[in-house]
């Protein structure tokens, strides 16, 4: 299945640099009909483009939803609240944005939606989402205009991935002009929602594109020979319901591939690039593992092709986090790491920070899986949305617990390129990649220490797998600086700047004391010359009352 785009750039030139992985930190800014704020002024989409998700808060829509087994837990008073909200909306209730939908229900009962558990909350949204039909069987789709994106870093990363996929293909077919890229959207609770986005992005970047309907539900259905139970498995494992109503073609394709999984395996043997979307890395992982947590046949195929350098694998956000062979972070914040520690436990629902959910694990506590991820990236722990969400402390503390003591935190709209054959890494994109190495922890008193680097576009290094550190670090000319837009929280970098000026910077974090100390002033020269990248700066975190 490929959803075609009319604007396709066929001028794809293989790059000089070769790599096997492109690990994106999330936040790839792209112009689309759902993200018009990312488009150059004057960009126009056709009338059939999907502009937002729409919900029906009407009596008939609610009565239909109440009949679905997933809402059997709703009480009579809860149903009355929803029906009353629909009456208040009148005709307007037939087409509501999510915010209008939320406000309409909250006007009747303030905490109604936040008090619902995940299963009921998401089922309610899915059952009331409108198809936005254009004609019978054809619904509105998100439209992408890659070339109309104001901030071109994301478009360049998509194009770079496409170029590398073509390079891989030309090793087998020298005259090839277009690579075949497969998109797997298993990270999302609703894996059908972003199909249009990713297929159009890579088509416009110059590739032939297929969507592979591989997700946790499909993996379970194949393993258990329960293809007739796919909708129920989607609800149980992924947490989505009623998807065939909105995505009839995609759900039919998934059903067909479940019955004939050899077609999935053949496509995995044919593709030149594989891209994993963002969302929840636990969902991505379970899409590639059997219900017994063993590598699936699909994963075995991809790993073998990766080892033979026949394919390039990319991912964004969760798609990057899941690539690690080390501990896989699953949730939490730096503040949560300082307050509650780093826990080998199941992460609570992402709604816990804003809703009244019950969980033994605090909403902000850092959680991780000791089993690791898919194992594509062997060099360390991975983290994403890095500087934007100030995740330095959480990655530092988790890396100290991992086997190889290396951590890589990738900023948004930025990517880490990984050459597995030569053990080299390099950075492209708008911001940078924070690396912590030689990290370790002492228990009495509780203290973490390590060495950190911050690499930006054009910087590269070699990973020494014996010493578990970076060497041969090459920083691009200090004339270039990274983007300092307001959306990036630069407090940590400001602390490093001060350490470079004063020789050391002690920061009181409340629950801990952070000490940043350059190994020599030479390590700060790049910062002093108006750069933002740096290398070989010692970092120590002393926790109080632990």
Locate each region found by the language model.
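C-terminal and late-domain segments of enzyme folds
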Residues: 5-179, 184, 189-197, 202-206, ...
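Low-complexity, highly charged intrinsically disordered N-terminal segments
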Residues: 183, 196-199, 207-210, 247, ...
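Short connector loops at secondary-structure junctions
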Residues: 187-190, 207-231
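A Trp-anchored, charged/polar loop motif used as the substrate-binding/catalytic surface
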Residues: 249-263, 297-300, 357-364
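Catalytic-core regions built around general acid/base machinery
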Residues: 263, 267, 294-309
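Short acidic, glycine-rich surface-loop motifs adjacent to enzyme active sites
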Residues: 268-289
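Catalytic nucleophile loop
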Residues: 275-278, 301-302, 306-327
